[in-house]
Amino acid sequence: MDHTQQSRKAAEAQPSRSKQTRFCDGFKLFLAALSFSYICKALGGVVMKSSITQIERRFDIPSSISGLIDGGFEIGNLLVIVFVSYFGSKLHRPKLIGIGCFIMGIGSILTALPHFFMGYYKYAKENDIGSLGNSTLTCFINQMTSPTGPSPEIVEKGCEKGLKSHMWIYVLMGNMLRGIGETPIVPLGISYLDDFAKEGHTSMHLGTLHTIAMIGPILGFIMSSVFAKIYVDVGYVDLNSVRITPNDARWVGAWWLSFIVNGLLCITSSIPFFFLPKIPKRSQEERKNSVSLHAPKTDEEKKHMTNLTKQEEQDPSNMTGFLRSLRSILTNEIYVIFLILTLLQVSGFIGSFTYLFKFIEQQFGRTASQANFLLGIITIPTMATAMFLGGYIVKKFKLTSVGIAKFVFFTSSVAYAFQFLYFPLLCENKPFAGLTLTYDGMNPVDSHIDVPLSYCNSDCSCDKNQWEPICGENGVTYISPCLAGCKSFRGDKKPNNTEFYDCSCISNSGNNSAHLGECPRYKCKTNYYFYIILQVTVSFFTAMGSPSLILILMKSVQPELKSLAMGFHSLIIRALGGILAPIYYGAFIDRTCIKWSVTSCGKRGACRLYNSRLFGFSYLGLNLALKTPPLFLYVVLIYFTKRKYKRNDNKTLENGRQFTDEGNPDSVNKNGYYCVPYDEQSNETPL
């Protein structure tokens, strides 16, 4: 008899175990698919950031416009983020994420399309390409050439083709579409993950997710490094006819290849989400035997949430309920402080990262390929390790909400302190005759002064808009052979095989020759290696606290409002940080330019040369200005968090058990959505 009853119970238990297994397998598949989508999302972001300088040169636009293009991703995200976050949680979240990944892939491919319609890239005037020895490049006494640029007839003729430069608008549209597609991935993905993870494992899953996502930036940096060394029109022109190198300020790599690869990967990542369930199967009893992830609420919060729940039951997607929910999070003092704090921090991060590669190129004389490779190989693995370590520390020591705030405050303070060490590493301006030095290469000049012609080139009637830099034997770079006073040349138009002679402005122990290309900056090589070490250190401490920031956000609001809170947070961050930060960073950087290119229409194009010192102080100073207020706001955040949870300490719950870790709600189940092993379930409500 007993044996028969045991067999019957075992038979009844088997389907539950099978259902639980399917549930766990579905969660693991979702976690794997979400990780892949995070990789693709991060890959696309790095590809855009690392291509900023090349996009500026290809479309002949200033940094403020390239900042707008970069902010297009956030503009697209901004258009739909709130509605996706609020209404998306009530729909099929995995399928919405899949649709988003597909749209993100289409947007990435659209970004690359202008390359195929713009024609070949012309890095110099057509008549200059034909012959290096013509009168526009070398100095011929009393030649009839305008010193300020080409004639109006030439400008008007070239301006018809110049209309293609407006193709950058399609790059902006593609980036906006990529932002729209990315919208559901973070709020819906993390809320789905939090709903169905095992109890106490949310922080660990988030740390793992962000660590795996670091594969995307690594691939992005390596891929961008490889493609940056490939000429933009590879496959269309004879590469032997290209006389510029990656060290030249006019060089444009195959930036479009990175976007095509990323687009195909994003489309592939969308496929698994269409085969995942809306909600994993679970019994009603499991739903009843679970409690909220959020900490016990005060009586006022309970009453408020009861009213919200009643309204949601009447019409879960009406606008009145949305506005009431929005008001609920905006009256949460912890949430508002956290919102302002992260807005400033993220603005500094987005703005600095957008122009990080330009900073390295201009400050230390490195190519885009070298900057991408080193950052991808060294910095990104360090950040991945720091993110995983940060998530592990929070879980291992079971940090409360106050503890998490203190932990992030510590990591942010250390990273902030190390940033002051960047300033001694700034390099001096490039020795550039006519821009930072007089034309004889002897005396420095202020960058805002229009340097007058010297005795050595005043009779050459040179075109000052001409950009064909040469390196003199005296170590000074000249804008063109004509402005160096060179009378003759020998070579095959290649940088290492072309020499200019009889250069009256060059004086170096009787040797007055020069070769094609800019002079290298050997003095900054040591500073660059110290910069990399410092960058790794700052990145480590910055990344260590990033997973914990998400936990502070989720624990500051009621569980029912998590998706909306994350969505509204993303809305503000993207509107005021993601969109505006690259634009005003770009505007600050444009003010440090001392030599602009001239478009075929005679208008200002991309910057050829920056004042290195002014660039460095503007870039680093703006970073510190945005990251100083958050340190004080962390103190305020800790104070309000302590005050909120102090009144809940050691409160006796309705079932007679005490909640001893109210500041650590991560150790509590969320509405029965967690994958609790069958043999661990009991008749008691798990806390």
Curated annotation (Swiss-Prot):
Side of membrane Extracellular, spans: 49-67, 120-165, 235-252, 351-370, 423-531, 590-623
Native source species? Rattus norvegicus (Rat)
Q: Which gene encodes it?
A: Slco1b2
Instruction: Keyword check for Nucleotidyltransferase, yes or no.
Output: no
Glycans attached where? 134, 496, 511
- Record-stated family: Belongs to the organo anion transporter (TC 2.A.60) family.
Its biological function? Answer: Mediates the Na(+)-independent uptake of organic anions such as taurochlate, bromosulfophthalein and steroid conjugates (estrone 3-sulfate, 17-beta-glucuronosyl estradiol, dehydroepiandrosterone sulfate). Also transports prostaglandin E2 and L-thyroxine (T4). Shows a pH-sensitive substrate specificity which may be ascribed to the protonation state of the binding site and leads to a stimulation of substrate transport in an acidic microenvironment. Hydrogencarbonate/HCO3(-) acts as the probable counteranion that exchanges for organic anions.
- Protein name (Swiss-Prot/TrEMBL): Solute carrier organic anion transporter family member 1B2
Keywords assigned: Cell membrane, Disulfide bond, Glycoprotein, Ion transport, Membrane, Phosphoprotein, Transmembrane, Transmembrane helix, Transport
Any matching Pfam family:
Kazal_2
Superkingdom assignment: Eukaryota
What ranges are annotated Cytoplasmic (topological domains)?
A: 1-28, 89-94, 195-213, 278-328, 395-398, 555-563, 642-687
Q: What is known of its domains?
A: A conserved histidine residue in the third TMD (His-115) may play an essential role in the pH sensitivity of SLCO1B2/OATP1B2-mediated substrate transport.
CC terms in the record's Gene Ontology section: basal plasma membrane; basolateral plasma membrane
Matching SUPFAM superfamilies: Kazal-type serine protease inhibitors, MFS general substrate transporter
> Which lineage ranks, top first, belong to the organism behind this chain?
Eukaryota, Metazoa, Chordata, Craniata, Vertebrata
**Disulfide bridges in this chain:** 456-486, 462-482, 471-505
The principal localisation class reads membrane
Region (Disordered) location = 286-311
